[in-house]
From Swiss-Prot:
It comes from Arabidopsis thaliana (Mouse-ear cress). Expressed in young flower meristems, ovules and the carpel margin meristem. Residues 572-587, 615-653, 687-699 have a biased composition (Polar residues). This is Probable transcriptional regulator SLK1. Probable transcription regulator that functions in the development of the carpel margin meristem similarly to SEUSS (SEU). In association with SEU, supports organ development from meristematic regions by facilitating auxin response and thus organ initiation, and by sustaining meristematic potential through the maintenance of PHABULOSA expression. DNA-binding adapter subunit of the SEU-SLK1 transcriptional corepressor of abiotic stress (e.g. salt and osmotic stress) response genes.
C-alpha cells in the first residue's frame, strides 16, 4: 500500500511537471524580472515603483507555475505533496526513538495558508489589504501556538528569549536611523544597478534623445557626476587630458586610484543624455557590464555606496568588440538616485571577428604563394621585371587591404569612439563658460561685452580678497616670511585729558627693531593718541614718528612696513569717513628744538606714551600709567639715554611682549639713540604740523647673526653712518602714500 501511494504521487508529479514544464521555465524569467524587480515591459514606461525592490531576483519554477494554475489542480498538487511527506513507517522502523517531537501540520491548514497568500498576491500586490493581513496573522498565531505546545518548557523559554532579543535589536535599529532616512535593505543598490542595465539594453531602435532624457531623470540625481579616469593608461596621449591639459592636473584627481595626473573626463547631469545618445550613435550596438562581488556601504547621512573592485565593460560594435577592465564605484542618494558614477579604467583590448579577417589573410597568402611559385619556376634570373612588378603590386594591395580592415577608424587609442571623446571635451568647455552664459543672459548683453565685464568684476573681486587677506594677516600678528623674518607686535593706545578749552593732539608711532639680511628680528610697533591741553587759544596738531633700530639690506622688511602703514591708512579712512583733511605732513631729518609754548608736563607725557598703549578712558590704562616707574631722562641731542622698562601688567599679550622687550634692553645695558621731535606755533591761527625724526644705525654683517638680545646692542653701538641713513629713510618714507595722505589722522 505504501509503495502504491509513493508511486502514484511520483507519477502524478511527473505528469504535472511535464504538463506545465514549458510554462514554468518561461515564468522563471518573466516573474523574476517583471514581478520582483518591477521593471516595466515597455522601455518608455518608467515609474517610481522601481525604487521598491523585493529580496530575490528569480523565483522557483514550481512556485511560479502554481500561481497560474487553477485552484483544483493546486489542491491536488498539495495533497500529493503532503501524501509524499506523510508516508506511514513500518513496524520495525525505530527512527522515532530519541528524536524531538515533530510538528504535525494538517493539510487543511497548509491549503488555507496557500489560498490566503494567493488571494493577497492577486488582490493587493503591495500587501496592504487589511482583511487579508488579519487572516494571515491569525493563521500565523495558530501555527505558533501549535509549535509552542509541541515544545518542551526549556525550548519554550529559549524561544521567548530569542524573540525578545530580536525585538530589542529591531527597536535599536529603528531608533538609530533618522526619520527622514528610509530603512536599508541589503542588496538594494545592486538590484538598482541591474534595473539600470536592463533599461540601457531595452532602448528604442531609433535611439531618440527623448528616451535618454527620461532615462537619466529616472536613474540620476540632478547633482550627479560621471567620471572616467584614464590615469593608469601608459599610452594615453594629450587627447586624454581634455581641453585644458595644463590646468587639468591641478583641477582633476581620481579618488579610486589616488593619482593626480589629470587624465580623465567629468560629465555633469546636463550632458549625460546627449553623451549616451552619441555613444550609441557612434556604432555601438550594445554595452555589457560584467561585475565582481559587490561591496555595499551605508553612510550616516543616508548615502549608499556600491563598489566593484573588478568590473569589465564590453562595448559591442558591428565588426569588433572592446573589452575594458577597471574599478567601478557608484554612490546612491537616499531615494536611490545615482549621485556619482566613477570608473577607473586600467586597460582595454580590441577584439576583431575571425570570420571577417580570415578572407583578407587568405587573399594575402595566395598572392604570396603565387609570387613564390613564379620565382621557383623561372628562377631568380629568369623572372622578368614586369612579372616581379606585378607580383609586388599584388602583395602590397592585399597587405594594404588587410591593414585598412584592421584599422578601426571610429576609435582612438583609448578604445572609445572619437565622437564620444570629442563631446566630453566640448562639455568641459561649456561647463567652464557656464558663468559667462548666465551673466550675459542676466545682463542681456553680447558675449564679447559680457566677457569684458565679467573679467573686470573677477579682477575686482580678486583684489578685494587679496586686500582682506593682507589685513587679516597683519591683524592676526602673522609672521613675515622671506630673507628677513620679523614678528610684529601691535599695540594701540589712546589717552585723553583736558585742562582748558582747547586740545592738543599728538600722534606718535615708535618703531624699534633690528633687521639685517637673513637675520631674524622683532619689530614692535605701537601707535597711540595722546590728548593734552595748553592755555593757548590755538589748536596745534603734532604728529611725531620716531624710528629706532638698524635696517641693513632689508628691502622686504621695508615693503612689509609700507604695506602695514597702507593697511592702517585704509582702516582709519573706512572708520572715519568725515576726517579732517586740513592737516599737513612734513618729514625732517634734522633735530628740532622743543616748542617754548609746550609745558614740561606735556613733553614728559609724550615721552611716557612712547612705551605705553591702551584704550580711551580705560581703567586698565589708567592703572598702567599709575604703576609705571622709572621715566626716561631728558638728555641733550645726539646723546643716548637709558629707557627703564615699566612694571605694569597689561592684560593683552602685545603689551606683555613690549614690556618684556624693554626689560631685556635695560638688563643687557643696551642703549638706543633717541630723537625727539616737537613742533608748535603761537598765535591765533590753527596749524597742523607733523615733525618726524628717525635715527638708524648699521649692523655690520659678519660673525654670527644678531639675536633678539644682541640686536639692540648692535643697534646702539654702531652709529657710524647716521646722516646717510637719515637721508635714505627720509627718501623712503616721503615716497610712501601713508605719510602723504591726510585722511588717516582725520578721526583721531
Amino acid at each position: 500500500m505504501n509503495r502504491t501511494v509513493v508511486s502514484g504521487a511520483v507519477e502524478s508529479s511527473f505528469s504535472l511537471t511535464d504538463a506545465v514544464g514549458t510554462e514554468a521555465l518561461n515564468m522563471q524569467r518573466s516573474s523574476g524580472i517583471n514581478n520582483n524587480m518591477r521593471i516595466p515591459t515597455s522601455p518608455m514606461s518608467f515609474s517610481s515603483n522601481s525604487v521598491n525592490i523585493p529580496g530575490s531576483l528569480v523565483l522557483d519554477g514550481s512556485a511560479a507555475s502554481m500561481q497560474h494554475l487553477p485552484q483544483q489542480q493546486q489542491q491536488q498538487l498539495l495533497q500529493q505533496q503532503t501524501g509524499q511527506g506523510s508516508v506511514p513507517m513500518r513496524e520495525n522502523n525505530y527512527s522515532h526513538v530519541d528524536k524531538k517531537p515533530r510538528l504535525e501540520v494538517k493539510q487543511e491548514d497548509m491549503l488555507q495558508q496557500q489560498i490566503l497568500q494567493q488571494l493577497i498576491q492577486r488582490q493587493d500586490p503591495t500587501g496592504r489589504n487589511p482583511q487579508m493581513q488579519a487572516l494571515l496573522q491569525q493563521q500565523r498565531l495558530r501555527q505558533h501556538q501549535q509549535m509552542l505546545q509541541s515544545m518542551s518548557p526549556s525550548q519554550r523559554l529559549q524561544l521567548q528569549q530569542q524573540q525578545q532579543l530580536r525585538q530589542q535589536l529591531q527597536q535599536q535599529g529603528t531608533q538609530q536611523i533618522p526619520p527622514n532616512v528610509r530603512p536599508y535593505e541589503v542588496g538594494v543598490c545592486a538590484r538598482k544597478l541591474m534595473m539600470y542595465l536592463y533599461h540601457l539594453q531595452q532602448r528604442p531602435a531609433e535611439n531618440c534623445i527623448t528616451y535618454w532624457r527620461k532615462f537619466v531623470a529616472e536613474y540620476f540625481s540632478p547633482r550627479a557626476k560621471q567620471r572616467l579616469c584614464l590615469s593608469q593608461y601608459e599610452s594615453a596621449g594629450h587627447h586624454a587630458l581634455g581641453m585644458f591639459p595644463q590646468a587639468a592636473p591641478d583641477m582633476w584627481q581620481c579618488d579610486l586610484c589616488g593619482t593626480k595626473s589629470g587624465k580623465g573626463f567629468e560629465a555633469t547631469f546636463d550632458v549625460l543624455a546627449r553623451l549616451i545618445e552619441i555613444k550609441f550613435a557612434s556604432g555601438i550596438i550594445d554595452e555589457l557590464l560584467y561585475l565582481d562581488h559587490p561591496r555595499e556601504n551605508r553612510f550616516p547621512n543616508g548615502l549608499m555606496m556600491l563598489e566593484y573592485r573588478k568590473a569589465v565593460q564590453e562595448t559591442v560594435h558591428e565588426q569588433f568588440r572592446v573589452v575594458r577592465e577597471g574599478h567601478l564605484r557608484i554612490i546612491f542618494s537616499q531615494d536611490l538616485k545615482i549621485l556619482s558614477w566613477e570608473f577607473c579604467a586600467r586597460r582595454h583590448e580590441e577584439l576583431l571577428l575571425r570570420r571577417l579577417i580570415a578572407p583578407q589573410v587568405n587573399q594575402l597568402l595566395q598572392v604570396a604563394q603565387k609570387c613564390q611559385s613564379t620565382i621557383s619556376e623561372s628562377g631568380s634570373e629568369g623572372v622578368s621585371q614586369q612579372d616581379l612588378q606585378s607580383n609586388s603590386n599584388m602583395v602590397l594591395g592585399a597587405g594594404r587591404q588587410l591593414a585598412k580592415f584592421m584599422e578601426l577608424q571610429s576609435l582612438n587609442d583609448l578604445g572609445y569612439p572619437k565622437r564620444y571623446i570629442r563631446t566630453l571635451q566640448i562639455s568641459e568647455v561649456v561647463k567652464s563658460m557656464k558663468d559667462l552664459m548666465n551673466f550675459t543672459g542676466e545682463q542681456k548683453i553680447g558675449p564679447i561685452e559680457g566677457l569684458k565685464r565679467l573679467l573686470e568684476q573677477t579682477v575686482t573681486v580678486k583684489l578685494q580678497k587679496q586686500k582682506m587677506q593682507e589685513m587679516e594677516q597683519f591683524g592676526n600678528n602673522g609672521a613675515i616670511n622671506g630673507p628677513v623674518q620679523a614678528q610684529m607686535v601691535l599695540t594701540s593706545g589712546t589717552m585723553n585729558g583736558s585742562t582748558g578749552n582747547n586740545t592738543n593732539n599728538h600722534h606718535q608711532i615708535v618703531g624699534r627693531g633690528a633687521m639685517s639680511g637673513p637675520a631674524e628680528g622683532q619689530m614692535v610697533i605701537s601707535s597711540g593718541t595722546v590728548s593734552g591741553a595748553t592755555a593757548n587759544n590755538n589748536s596745534n596738531n603734532h604728529n611725531q614718528i620716531v624710528g629706532r633700530g638698524a635696517m641693513n639690506g632689508s628691502a622686504q622688511a621695508a615693503a612689509a612696513l609700507t604695506n602695514y602703514q597702507s593697511m592702517l591708512m585704509r582702516q582709519n579712512a573706512m572708520n572715519n569717513p568725515n576726517s579732517n583733511t586740513g592737516k599737513q605732513e612734513g618729514f625732517s631729518s634734522q633735530n628740532p628744538t622743543p616748542n617754548s609754548n609746550q609745558s614740561p608736563s606735556s613733553s614728559s607725557q609724550q615721552r611716557h606714551n612712547l612705551v605705553t598703549g591702551g584704550f580711551p578712558n580705560s581703567p586698565q590704562m589708567q592703572q598702567q600709567q599709575r604703576t609705571m616707574n622709572g621715566p626716561t631722562n631728558i638728555l641733550p641731542q645726539n646723546h643716548p639715554h637709558q629707557l627703564q622698562s615699566p612694571h605694569s601688567h597689561g592684560n593683552t599679550p602685545e603689551q606683555q611682549m613690549l614690556h618684556q622687550l624693554l626689560q631685556e634692553m635695560s638688563e643687557n645695558g643696551g642703549s638706543v639713540q633717541q630723537q625727539q621731535a616737537f613742533s608748535g606755533q603761537s598765535g591765533s591761527n590753527s596749524n597742523a604740523e607733523r615733525n618726524t625724526t628717525a635715527s638708524t644705525s648699521n649692523i655690520s654683517g659678519g660673525g654670527r647673526a644678531p639675536s633678539r638680545n644682541n640686536s639692540f646692542k648692535a643697534a646702539s653701538n654702531n652709529n657710524l653712518h647716521f646722516s646717510e641713513d637719515i637721508s635714505i629713510t627720509d627718501h623712503d618714507f616721503s615716497e610712501d602714500g601713508f605719510f602723504n595722505n591726510n585722511d588717516i589722522y582725520g578721526g583721531l
